[in-house]
């Protein structure tokens, strides 16, 4: 274990689970601790890796800390789910799960798995009024299935883990928790670890309450919680770190899906979507679905953060995303709503989408990643199967409220009607400078680098003069720093500003920063190919920098006699993994 954690001077047990970091098809271990919080508890964290800096997510938790003599010291006085991340990276983080009390459930038909006890196989619930209690430290290696039962409870602080079951065993060991055609279901407190498919599926059920569940999924299709064709379901106080989607609503021929709420949760997606309605929506109605008070702390592969994807016959309506905070999500779309055919759909007839609300959404970004790299999208299917009445209210992107689809980074395509973008106490006639970022000249190779000029053009189409300070910025940060400039533009006039750049090969986004939030959001994407020659000693040194501003050792790259040569000038042994596509 990398971490040692003390609560009020008492050593805590540190657990470990598999997660999917990067690159593709790999796994690593993430460490976590759990403890009861009665009052203000002092937590001291030590790491085998030297702690130079730290961040504690979600930022909305407002947890203050100090680093003293290489240790992180913080206080916790309430139930929280926190990611402690050191030295500017989310790799090698520590999760903290603090809870108030343990729920042991009703004691009729009581199945108890005690501490340090390990059971294997499928635990099948076949009777009404059954409770499965998994004590902290206990593990069920397998899955839990309940069919056609009323009043069932699954609770405790222990694990349901499928690490012993391979992909080929999915026929019998797919989902860790599978609840089918049941009523009055409570699932509370447990940990789901390394599911072979969706971590938890609720299908054809009524009156379900899921709370304080921690889900770790490192495999393909390891969704967090899928609510399928069910009614009156509350999902709250959840943590997910999964390969696939975190919170999902579907309909799989088990009736309408309605009155579903996901709330007060922390989501970390290593590959796919944090919140999704779809794609399979085989029901007459999918309605009254709400996602509220949710923190997305990481999601970095470009998938939509909030999506509705529809290819079946359902009428999808009254979907709300409210009070969502977004932190580290480089490349992701904020919103994606589409009606389209897909490989997952079976209905011959298409449906429609009505009355969708996104409100109080706050995109925070990170120090090195504070812009949206992908535009959002809304697209219907036909005149008959269309999308109507989509409202965006109080959408804050890096401190600036969007008042137009363009400011929102929203592309609106065919068969869409009734889009509104508003914000409290702001009017659509707010004065904003229109902006352009263009290549003045093509970037030319120069001694292993590229040199070129980027032009910024600001247009003042208002009837008042506008002035202030702005900055031309590049992500990822590489050889160039932000360049500040002053603007003073008369009504109906434009000004241009040129920036001479020297860049290494790589992919870049050029964008503008403005503290007054009066310059519209715009960015320019550019890709500069690597320069390769035969003589490696003549090649430039490449410093690899990713979107997190993580830097690797410098290397030289050459191609000679159909061989790829990679050289590091350092005398130290260098390990690397090469991927080709």
Task: Pin down the residues of each PLM region.
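Short acidic, flexible loop segments centered on an aromatic residue
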Residues: 464-477, 571-580
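Short, solvent-exposed loop/linker segments at the N-terminal edge
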Residues: 35-37, 442-450, 556-559
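Terminal connector regions
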Residues: 503-543
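Asparagine-centered strand-capping/turn motif at beta-strand->loop junctions
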Residues: 458-462, 566-570
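Extracellular/periplasmic carbohydrate-active domains that bind, remodel
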Residues: 1-438, 463-464, 487-490
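Structural beta-strand segments of beta-rich domains
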Residues: 41, 450-456, 562-564
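Intrinsically disordered, low-complexity Pro/Gly/Ser/Thr-rich segments with frequent PxxP/GP/PP motifs
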Residues: 478-505, 581
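Low-complexity, Pro/Ser/Thr- and charge-rich linker/hinge segments at domain boundaries
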Residues: 98-115, 527-547
